[in-house]
Amino acid sequence: MDTSGHFHDSGVGDLDEDPKCPCPSSGDEQQQQQQPPPPPAPPAVPQQPPGPLLQPQPPQPQQQQSQQQQQQQSQQQQQQAPLHPLPQLAQLQSQLVHPGLLHSSPTAFRAPTSANSTAILHPSSRQGSQLNLNDHLLGHSPSSTATSGPGGGSRHRQASPLVHRRDSNPFTEIAMSSCKYSGGVMKPLSRLSASRRNLIEAEPEGQPLQLFSPSNPPEIIISSREDNHAHQTLLHHPNATHNHQHAGTTAGSTTFPKANKRKNQNIGYKLGHRRALFEKRKRLSDYALIFGMFGIVVMVIETELSWGLYSKDSMFSLALKCLISLSTVILLGLIIAYHTREVQLFVIDNGADDWRIAMTYERILYISLEMLVCAIHPIPGEYKFFWTARLAFSYTPSRAEADVDIILSIPMFLRLYLIARVMLLHSKLFTDASSRSIGALNKINFNTRFVMKTLMTICPGTVLLVFSISLWIIAAWTVRVCERYHDQQDVTSNFLGAMWLISITFLSIGYGDMVPHTYCGKGVCLLTGIMGAGCTALVVAVVARKLELTKAEKHVHNFMMDTQLTKRIKNAAANVLRETWLIYKHTKLLKKIDHAKVRKHQRKFLQAIHQLRGVKMEQRKLSDQANTLVDLSKMQNVMYDLITELNDRSEDLEKQIGSLESKLEHLTASFNSLPLLIADTLRQQQQQLLTAFVEARGISVAVGTSHAPPSDSPIGISSTSFPTPYTSSSSC
């Protein structure tokens, strides 16, 4: 808070404050000492604020003189002593808090709108409408009442601006809670509503606002524009304010809840952290493959150079082996870092609290085996052992002194498993979020096996070619290294001869002209034969798949065959009709029957019939074959359309039945109300009949007494004058 009373970094919003605050900044101290005390402010014009107002209690007229005296005394003390906000902590903390504010909720700070109110709440330009808690506290405290002017203006604001601790002020707590999601120390949020859900989760529901009692006043932190950075530091380190407070004051000791900071991490942070771990794991896998391949290449170079150019005890061999050892150490470190990232991903995905939950026996065994495989490499130095073998054709024993580096060099090719891991982590199926979501819905595990299957489906020829050539070269070099100590004739120890041996073993031919002598070479040839059998089967499957027609090609082929068969059926039917006509012609129309021509046309007639039957049979087979080509998805779509149509019809039928039911109910209600209508109609007609009868009787009596002769009716009315339902118009 600066001298104008505005919150700059608390994230709460801008609060209007009277510029006549008795706590100026350090740069305005001399001007405040020279200027005389300001006159009392005129009564403020009442405004209609956009938000609720806080109306303090107006001071009594008897207290105005004492208030002015206290104001003059405070101004004289400020002119005599150096104006700094820190020495006023004891005075500000000794002020009593209004007892109505204790154990109240945040909604209790709102007061009804009044024209005499001076603490007007207005919506802030940054964070919306916020509550000026300091004005409310000063307005309800005795000091604010004592400093109020006679006009009821803004004199109660002349107390020094204060900021409550985060635990005592709910709005400061909201701002501080929003800062931990925005990432700044006291950085205000541009969108406070974006973190409203997190703030609701962070604050306990139903907990009222707990203010400090007068015996234990809240810790007050005063800052100016120049002390903004120090104010931010004090807010995050509340214990540091004890060094600047008065000796007789005591501050409430409350700390920020560190447990909520971990629990209230939103899902966006977890997803971002998970994505970063994915990228780090992919980079670590790439670096591990690079250093693993580098070690293999240096090992091959050192083995070839030490066999033909220099010995194992030379400096060149020692330098190359040291380079291999260095690359191996780096590789082991990268593998450990890779598995560390995997454990972190497991913790994030499963919401575990402890990383030791992910360390199962299977994972520990897998990591140990991987470390053991990658740790094997030639040790710097010269180490020998005696190797005994039996020659192939002569069966004579052969004993030679070999290097230990052979045993440690050949297993280094096991590091090539890192290629499969890199292919998995760089695959679009593994990195794409949409494919992973669809795979998760279909319960598909995205592993190396799935990636290899997709590669074999997309480009089977390329995969088989690369795998076969790589296996051929590695197996040939391994056989050459294994056979070099026991091959006096330089047959299998030659690289070209070893490639010939591996090729005939890979293709399962086995001429027998070249055979390995050592168990090392025999084991390599055995593995090569097994892999060759598998690759041969894959080649046959790939070739058969390439030669097979696709569904579109099959549909086109069936359409063309059906067209040709239709033409053949027409031709066969025409031949049958032609031969039938010719037989009839030669037997019935001609005078002289030629039996040779008749037999000829009969023979052609039978051939045409058999041809027609054969073509029809081929057409039936083609139609059966075409029916088997109907896709399941197409059938499913057809069934879906039929079911949809049936559902629509059933809905229409239900609507019609509903309308019929409503009409039937209406008719039932009409029939039920019909007796009442008939009764009402009869009652009305009876009333009309009685009325007409009375009127007719009165008229007839009047006429009979004056002019008409007496009638034969006993009541004195003629039958013609008596209205009946059949003669009276009113009866209708």
From Swiss-Prot:
UniProt feature, compositional bias: Low complexity: 62-82, 139-148, 718-732
Residue ranges of the region described as Calmodulin-binding: 562-638
Keywords: Calmodulin-binding, Cell membrane, Coiled coil, Cytoplasm, Ion channel, Ion transport, Membrane, Phosphoprotein, Transmembrane, Transmembrane helix, Transport
Domain of life: Eukaryota
Renumbered residue ranges of the record's region Disordered: 1-82, 119-161, 241-260, 704-732
Membrane topology: Multi-pass membrane protein
Subcellular location as annotated: Cell membrane; Cytoplasm, Myofibril, Sarcomere, Z line
GO cellular component terms, A-Z: cytoplasm; plasma membrane; Z disc
Spans traversing the lipid bilayer: 289-309, 316-336, 367-387, 406-426, 455-475, 524-544
GO molecular function: calmodulin binding; inward rectifier potassium channel activity; small conductance calcium-activated potassium channel activity
Biased amino acid composition, Polar residues: 119-133, 241-257
Gene3D superfamilies membership: 1.10.287.70
Catalyses which reaction(s): K(+)(in) = K(+)(out)
Bias (Basic and acidic residues): 1-11
Intramembrane residues: 495-515
Record text on subunit structure and interactions: Homodimer. Heteromultimer with KCNN2 or KCNN1; this modulates plasma membrane expression and consequently the small conductance calcium-activated potassium channel activity. The complex is composed of 4 channel subunits each of which binds to a calmodulin subunit which regulates the channel activity through calcium-binding. Interacts with CALM1.
Described purpose of this protein according to its UniProt entry: Small conductance calcium-activated potassium channel that mediates the voltage-independent transmembrane transfer of potassium across the cell membrane through a constitutive interaction with calmodulin which binds the intracellular calcium allowing its opening. The current is characterized by a voltage-independent activation, an intracellular calcium concentration increase-dependent activation and a single-channel conductance of 10 picosiemens.
Protein name: Small conductance calcium-activated potassium channel protein 3
